[in-house]
Structure formats: structure tokens, C-alpha cells
Amino acid sequence: NGNLLMPAFKNAHTHSAMTFGRSFSDDLPLQSWLYDKIFPLEAKLTAEDIYHLSRLAFLEYLESGISACFDMYYFPEAMAKAAVDAGFRTVMCGAVNNFKESPALLDEYYNTYNNHHPLVSYQLGFHAEYTTNRSIMEAIAALAEKYKAPVYMHASETESEVQGCIGRYGMTPTALFEQLGLWNYGGGAFHSVWVSNEDLNIYKKHGVYAVLNAGSNAKLASGIAPVEKMLQMGIPLAVGTDGPS
């Protein structure tokens, strides 16, 4: 009847509960959008909000042929309940930064939600270098060593992010993450737009996934990831939507 039976899509990077910000402040670059618009709103969200906002996203995913997502957000208890109630598979990822969550909570969540429900699992992660101080990143690297686990974060999404990291540490975010031991057991870098050849060699060395979000990068005019070069180098790739806002 003209139908196609195939495996479902998997959304490799998203912030599902950000359905609250859809079509909100669409004309701003990333940093202004985050700090001036999104972060102040996120500070007001409750666990109940996250449940309903996530469940809306999960139902939209299912309608679009997406059966699982890799979800970086807050209130994992609410995210997990929304996933189970919707019959949707979710891999939750830590979103630690300077003003939300902590390495201690990340440790707790890792143990709790990897033994919670067959549809739910949890990975170590933090938001990004520019929102997370060195001591927090070092503590997360220690957790990666403790659990022999991969670590995931936003990386090299914009040119200003990379230049800011070079100004703070004298190296790119990718080089910093390697120096700290965050990728000793692999992981993933969300966006990976402004990456150098040296950065890509680090990805290849540690088996780090470049998790691409072309639609989000186009909307924010962040740039275009060097996908052809990544493919030529044999770097593992995955594709995500980024947040629905």
C-alpha cells in the first residue's frame, strides 16, 4: 500500500522539555538567546513543568517516527516518568554547570537511572566548557574514571565559544577535554562545528562521536560542521535535532 517498514529514528541530541521556548526569541545568536532569554525562564521551571513539557516532546517524536532520544535536561525524575508513561525510550544525560546540578548529583543520578526502568538510562555529562568551571569538569572526569564511562557535552558550537576557551585555557574545548581526561572512555561532542584538524584527531583517538545538529546551527547562524572531513577520517557521527525551541 505504499508504506515503508524500517527501524525508527533516534534523536542523538535534544533538550526535550524546551518545548516551552518554541518560537520564542527566534532572532538572537546563541549566547544572547541563552543568557538573556532561556536561562531566566529555565530557572522558574518545576519538576511538574518538565514532566508535561517532556511528554509533549516525546509524543511529537513518536508521531515523527523517532522512538528514542539522548536528552540533556534537568529534573531527571520527571523526564523518566514522562518517558515511561509515553512508552518512549530515553537516554538522559547530565547537564551540570556552574549554576545547576553538581558532580555529586550526577553521581547519584548515574546510579539511580541506570537501574530504574528498561526504557530509561543515564550518561555522564555537563552543559559546556563556557558554563562549567574547571573544578567541576575535573570532578566529572573523576566520575568517568570511576565508572569507566563516556562523557557528553556541547562543544565547539560557535566560533566565539572556541575563542573564549582559548582565551581562558590557551587551547580549544576539545583539547581541554582531552587534557582533563573527560574522554578517556569515549563520549560525544554536541555540534562540533568549529573544530580544527587537531580537534578531529582527538575525536578519532578517543572514539568521540560528533553529534551534528544542522537545523539548529542554521537557525542560529552558528556555522556548518565539516562533515565530509569527519567522514573521511572515520569519525563516528550521529544526528540530533537540538532543543525544540
Model-inferred region functions:
Residues 78-196:
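Metal-coordinating catalytic core of metallo-dependent amide/deamination hydrolases
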Residues 14, 72, 79, 155, ...:
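Active-site metal-binding loops of divalent metal-dependent hydrolases
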Residues 132, 182-245:
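Active-site-adjacent C-terminal substructures of enzyme catalytic domains
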Residues 22-87, 107-116:
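Alpha-helical scaffold segments that flank or form the walls of functional sites
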Residues 69-70, 151, 210, 238:
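Hydrophobic residues within beta-strands of alpha/beta enzymes
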Residues 1-6:
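Histidine-rich, glycine-flanked metal-binding segment
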Residues 7-19, 150-159:
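Histidine-centered catalytic micro-motifs
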